[in-house]
Every structure is written in C-alpha cells, then in structure tokens.
Design a protein with these regions (language model features):
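Surface/interface-facing alpha-helical segments and adjacent flexible terminal/loop regions used
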Residues: 1-150
Length: 150
C-alpha cells in the first residue's frame, strides 16, 4: 500500500515479533493471531538464513530470502502435514484445491515478509545488517521452528 498509515498483517508481524519472541505462550484471540504465529516463525527462519549465510549486503539478502520463500525443496509444511509446528491451531485443507490455495497464500506471505523484513534488517546505506535484529535469529518463538533444516 502507498498509504503509510495503513498497517497490514506483515507490518504487524514485524512490529510485534521482537517483543513476542521471548514468550513461550501466545494468546490467540482470532484468525489473525494464527497468521502472526506463522509469520513470527518465518521471520526467525529469515534471520537465521541471513546470519548463517553471513550475508552482509542488502541485495544478497534479498536474493536469499526470495529463494527461501519460493524453494519448494524446503517444503515448508502446511497445516495437516506432520512437520507443521502447530497442528491443533490451524484447520488442515479439506481437499486438493484448498491445499493448493493454502500453499499459494503462505508462499505469498513468505515472499512479502522477506521483502519488508530486509528493509528493517538492512536499514542503513552502508549495507550492513542490523546486529540488533540478527540477535533474534537464535531465539525460538514458543520454542518452535517452521522448518527443521536451514
């Protein structure tokens, strides 16, 4: 959106990630909170990727996070799959069409999160990542992770 006053779920996840990453519990008041949980876990995956790959340039980070979001070999699990970290919080897809729709939606969330997160992690013109943001790469929200390998 062009309106700086407009805040969507991605902006909200970035804003509330740091204070919430320290908690093992998260009160779910509605469907948006479930999406926030997924995005918090994905932010952690992004930060781990930047830290582990020793990425020090914004362009390189952009390429890495785009690859991470789109990489089908990573097989980001969706609700209903055994590896999904919160099986009881999300309703699994009822059929193949819902499965495909959910995969596409979550992939779009991951792509947009990567784009916006890079702007926060690489805030300065020197191109170096914010150590303050990267320190959260080692934290695990609710003691869970979205994937098992990075």
């Amino acid at each position: 959106m062009d309106d700086p006053a407009y805040e969507d779920i991605i902006d909200e996840a970035i804003l509330y990630f740091r204070p919430n990453v320290f908690f093992r519990n998260f009160e779910i008041k509605g469907p948006a909170d479930r999406t926030l949980i997924y995005l918090f876990l994905y932010i952690t995956e992004c930060l781990k990727r930047i830290l582990q790959q020793k990425i020090v340039q914004k362009l390189q980070a952009s390429k890495e996070l785009t690859t991470l979001a789109l990489d089908s070999r990573r097989g980001f699990p969706i609700p209903g799959e055994q590896a999904f970290p919160f099986p009881s919080l999300f309703k699994p897809p009822a059929n193949a069409q819902e499965d495909e729709t959910m995969r596409a939606y979550l992939q779009q969330l991951r792509q947009e999160m990567g784009v916006r997160l890079i702007e926060r992690v690489f805030p300065n013109s020197d191109g170096m990542p914010s150590k303050w943001w990267l320190c959260f790469a080692k934290r695990r929200f609710m003691d869970k992770q979205l994937t098992h390998t990075i």
